[in-house]
Design a protein with these regions (language model features):
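N-terminal amphipathic/basic membrane-interacting segments and domains
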Residues: 19-359
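N-terminal export leaders
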Residues: 3-7
Length: 359
């Protein structure tokens, strides 16, 4: 009976050593790392927005590589002893006692490598204006035209939008707000679109067009109003789109786009700086007249980290956050993440070689 008990215990341990650990970790780990990287990405973007409000230098660090390794170890220690304090007349075998100790070890050893975003192409993409094609691609992809234009355009065909220079804010003109309002209606109805045309010289040109047949007569009249406000031919339905700050011809639309750095600077004006920081001169007060522009992005500040926040970061001893109930700010933040991803293009710097222990 003793021998049978020992054999049963050893057989019971065998499945532990044969069980596959790796496949069961993929789902849990992938989701966990995805959430962690996305959370840190948002916090980094918010931190750089807050830094710009304080005239500090933004900086980006990329998660270059994640390698996760697991080690499962088992150790079985048998012990045999002789118990003298036993009932009188016990045989030698009855006085023998034994035990079996099982020790399992589970080690998770993730290796994360980081890379500062100092590549020339990344810095250049932050500094140069976005191409008009990127703006219209975002609109074509379904991003609201009012969000896209308000964040990425200084002017459209000479009609001035909201602009920021340092801490001075210039509101968008009434004509600009009306044009964006009409284009948003056209976007929702599917009456506006864009395409790429290739000319005889093999050069590509960007064309924005309006689908006016069979649309609501009221919307058709508003689209004519928008073309008049933009000083383009109201009878035309297709227009070439080019980069420029000045008004183009009646057959083309110019777009004065912003760089990603200016997009971040614009969002920085929505940071609520603590009063004592303003009084101490740590951040400048906003100048100019914001007009009637409703902010699409709001960053709150306080001494304690809130429990219900979309993303938060700590800077200079204060917490700054985007409220999780502020859908407009969350949508703006999500669009900013796409713009930052567009800037992170080009040749990647080689990641470091990692030596991974396999036993």
């Amino acid at each position: 009976m003793k021998r049978r008990g020992w054999l049963c215990a050893l057989v019971a341990l065998c499945p532990l050593s044969c069980e596959h650990l790796g496949p069961r970790t993929i789902v849990a780990d992938r989701v966990a790392y995805d959430d962690a990287v996305a959370t840190s990405w948002k916090e980094q973007a918010l931190l750089n927005i807050v830094k710009l409000r304080y005239f500090d230098t933004p900086f980006f660090v990329d998660v270059a590589q994640i390698v996760s390794g697991y080690t499962l170890g088992e150790q079985v220690t048998p012990a045999l002893g002789f118990n003298q304090a036993f009932f009188p007349g016990a045989t030698f075998g009855q006085r023998l006692v034994g035990n079996l100790a099982l020790q399992e070890t589970y080690l998770d050893r993730p290796t994360v490598s980081y890379a500062p975003q100092t590549r020339p192409d990344f810095i250049r993409n932050l500094a140069i204006p976005l191409p008009p094609s990127a703006v219209l691609y975002m609109m074509q992809a379904g991003y609201p035209v009012d969000v896209v234009f308000d964040l990425t355009l200084d002017a459209i065909n000479g009609v001035q939008g909201r602009s920021v220079s340092g801490a001075e804010v210039r509101p968008a003109s009434a004509e600009y707000r009306r044009v964006v309002e009409i284009l948003r209606k056209a976007q929702l109805s599917g009456s506006v679109g864009m395409r790429i045309e290739v000319g005889k010289d093999k050069k590509e040109s960007l064309v924005m067009f309006f689908r006016e047949p069979d649309i609501d007569p009221e919307l058709a009249a508003e689209l004519v109003e928008a073309r008049n406000l933009l000083h383009i031919d109201p009878a035309r339905r297709e227009f070439k789109v080019v980069f420029g700050a000045a008004r183009g011809s009646g057959e083309e639309v110019t777009m004065a786009t912003r760089s990603l750095f200016r997009v971040l600077t614009l969002l920085a004006t929505s940071v609520q700086v603590p009063d004592d920081h303003l009084a101490e001169g740590r951040a400048p007060p906003l100048g100019g007249d914001p007009g009637t522009d409703r902010p699409r992005f709001t960053v709150f500040s306080g001494c304690q980290k809130p429990k219900d926040c979309f993303t938060a970061t700590c800077y200079r001893g204060r917490w700054f956050w985007v409220d999780d109930r502020d859908a407009e700010s969350k949508r703006t933040m999500a669009f900013l993440m796409v713009l930052l991803a567009l800037a992170d293009t080009g040749t990647k710097e080689p990641v470091p070689f990692l030596t991974i222990q396999t036993n």
